[in-house]
Regions:
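Active-site proximal beta-strand in glycosyltransferases
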Residues: 152-153, 171-190
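A charged, aromatic-enriched C-terminal amphipathic alpha-helix characteristic of glycosyltransferases
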Residues: 402-432
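Conserved acidic donor-binding segment of nucleotide-sugar-dependent glycosyltransferases
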Residues: 381-388, 396-401
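Acidic donor-binding loop of glycosyltransferase active sites
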Residues: 319, 331-348, 359-361
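Short hydrophobic beta-strand element within catalytic cores of glycosyltransferases
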Residues: 352-355, 362-366
C-alpha cells in the first residue's frame, strides 16, 4: 500500500525555526514525515532585494534542508504580488516609527500614517489578501498537483487559500484540502487596530469566513479558536492542532544555587511582542531590581527591534542582556531559570509559552498568555496582569528558592505529558487517514 501523500504549501522558511510560526510548522512537517506520510513542500519564495535574509535560500539553508531530508519544491520569482514589496517595507517602518514616537514624544503619532511624509497613501495601506496573490502561483500549484498527485493538501495561513483555485472539480472531490490557520486573523487584526498598531494582514471577518469555507478541514491552534471557526464555517470539519516540541528525555531538576534569578524572554519582532516587552521593562523592571537580585536575558529578533525603537532602554538597566537570534532554543533556555511572557493582546497559541514548559522552565505570563493551556498547567504557571503583579511575583520567586524548585518540577512533569505527539496531533492524524 502506498503512503498517504501530502502537498504542504507555505511561503515561510520554516526550517530556520526563527519564529513561533516557523517552529510550529517545522515540528508539524517533522511529525507527519515520521508518521509515514509522504510530504512534499510547495514553497513560494521571492528573489528580489526585499528582506534578502528571509527570502534568499543560503548554503546554510541547503545544509539544514538536506539534514532534515525535506522534499521542497522551490517556486521562485522576481515578481512579488501586487504592492507587497512596498507594503511590507512600510509595515516594518511603521512598527519602528510607532514605538519610537511613543517613547520620544508627548503626543502619539498615528501609526496608520507612513513613517515618512513623502510616502504615498498607497504605500501606507496595510497588506490584504489580494497582496499575497502571486500571479503565477496558481499555475505552479496546479503543476505540482499533477506531478505529485497528493491525497491531501495542507495550506499554511489563510493568505494562501487562493491556491485551491488550482484544483479542478474532479481533483477537489478526491483531494482532502486542509487549512492550518495559526490564528483567527480577523480578531487578531482588530486587536492590533484597537491599539493603533499595524497588523501584518488587514482582514475582515467576512473575508476570513469566505476563505476558510473553501476547505474541507480547518486546523485551529487551540480549543477556543476552534469554536470560533465552527461558527464561521459550520459545514467544515474543525479540529485542534497545537504545538508539540520534539520530546526531550526526562528533565533533572537541580536545586538552585545562584543568588541571582535569571528570567528570560525570547520572541520575534512583531508589534505585540515589542509593546509587551517595552511596557514590562518601563513599568516593572526597576522596582523588581530594587527588591531582589535578578537579571533579564532577551533573545530572538525582538532584540534588534527594541534596540531600534528604544535605543536608550538597555543603557538604563545594566542587568538586562541581549543574546540576539540563537541557533538552538536550548542555548537560550539553559541560561535562564524562569521564562516570562508579558503579552497584552493577541490570538492563537503562544508558542514561546509551550517551549518554556517543554524545557522545564516555570512560566510567568498573563491571562492572554494562558490561552490554549489546560487547567492542569496551573502548577507550573503564574499569571500577572498588572505591573504590580509582575513585581510581586518575580520578587517572590527570586527570594524563595524552594518555590522556584517546585515550579521547575511542575514544569518538567508537564513537559512530558502536556505536549505529547499523541495529544497534539491525534485529531489531525485521524482526519488525514479517514477523510476522503
Amino acid at each position: 500500500m502506498t503512503s498517504h501523500r501530502i502537498l504542504f504549501a507555505t511561503d515561510l522558511p520554516f526550517w530556520r525555526r526563527s519564529t513561533g510560526a516557523e517552529q510550529r510548522i517545522a515540528r508539524l512537517v517533522e511529525y507527519l514525515s515520521q508518521s509515514g506520510y509522504c510530504v512534499r513542500i510547495f514553497l513560494l519564495c521571492e528573489t528580489t532585494e526585499l528582506n534578502q535574509d528571509n527570502s534568499i535560500i543560503t548554503e546554510k539553508d541547503q545544509q539544514t534542508i538536506r539534514a532534515q531530508n525535506l522534499d521542497i519544491e522551490f517556486k521562485r520569482s522576481s515578481h512579488p504580488p501586487r504592492q507587497l514589496s512596498k507594503k511590507a517595507a512600510w509595515h516594518l517602518k511603521a512598527i519602528k516609527h510607532h514605538f519610537g514616537s511613543n517613547r520620544t514624544q508627548q503626543h502619539q503619532t498615528s501609526p496608520a500614517q507612513p513613517a515618512s511624509q513623502n510616502e504615498s497613501l498607497e504605500t501606507a495601506t496595510p497588506t490584504t489578501l489580494a497582496d499575497y496573490r502571486w500571479p503565477w502561483a496558481i499555475d505552479a500549484f496546479a503543476d505540482s498537483i499533477r506531478s505529485f498527485a497528493p491525497d491531501s493538501v495542507i495550506i499554511e495561513y489563510v493568505k494562501l487559500s487562493y491556491l485551491l483555485e488550482a484544483l479542478t472539480a474532479s481533483q477537489r472531490k478526491k483531494i482532502h484540502c486542509l487549512l492550518d490557520t495559526h490564528d483567527v486573523l480577523h480578531l487578531r487584526n482588530k486587536q492590533f487596530q484597537e491599539r493603533g498598531l499595524v497588523h501584518w494582514l488587514d482582514i475582515s471577518q467576512v473575508e476570513e469566513t469566505q476563505a476558510v469555507q473553501l476547505f474541507d478541514t480547518i486546523l485551529a491552534i487551540q480549543n477556543e479558536e476552534a469554536d470560533v471557526f465552527r461558527n464561521l464555517a459550520p459545514k467544515q470539519n474543525v479540529l485542534v492542532c497545537g504545538h508539540a516540541p520534539l520530546q526531550l528525555p526526562p528533565l533533572k531538576i537541580q536545586p538552585t544555587t545562584s543568588e541571582i534569578l535569571t528570567v528570560g524572554y525570547i520572541a520575534s519582532a512583531n508589534a505585540s511582542n515589542l509593546q509587551s516587552l517595552t511596557n514590562f521593562i518601563n513599568q516593572s523592571w526597576k522596582p523588581i531590581s530594587q527588591r531582589c537580585k535578578i537579571r533579564l536575558v532577551i533573545a530572538g529578533m525582538i532584540c534588534d527591534a527594541i534596540s531600534t525603537s528604544s535605543p536608550d532602554l538597555f543603557k538604563e538597566h545594566s542587568n538586562i542582556a541581549r543574546l540576539g537570534c540563537v541557533s538552538e532554543l536550548a542555548d537560550f533556555y539553559h541560561q535562564i531559570d524562569v521564562a516570562i511572557n508579558p503579552v497584552a493582546f493577541g490570538t492563537g497559541l503562544k508558542i514561546k509559552n509551550c517551549e518554556a514548559i517543554f524545557f522545564g522552565k516555570p512560566l510567568v505570563t498573563t491571562t492572554i498568555g494562558m490561552d490554549g493551556f489546560s487547567a492542569e498547567s496551573s502548577e507550573s504557571l503564574m499569571v500577572c496582569n498588572s505591573p504590580e503583579d509582575w513585581v510581586d511575583c518575580l520578587v517572590e520567586i527570586a527570594q524563595n528558592p524552594s518555590r522556584q524548585t517546585s515550579l521547575q518540577q511542575a514544569a518538567a512533569k508537564l513537559s512530558q505529558t502536556g505536549f505529547s505527539d499523541q495529544e497534539v496531533y491525534s485529531e489531525l492524524d485521524n482526519a488525514l487517514r479517514h477523510k476522503k
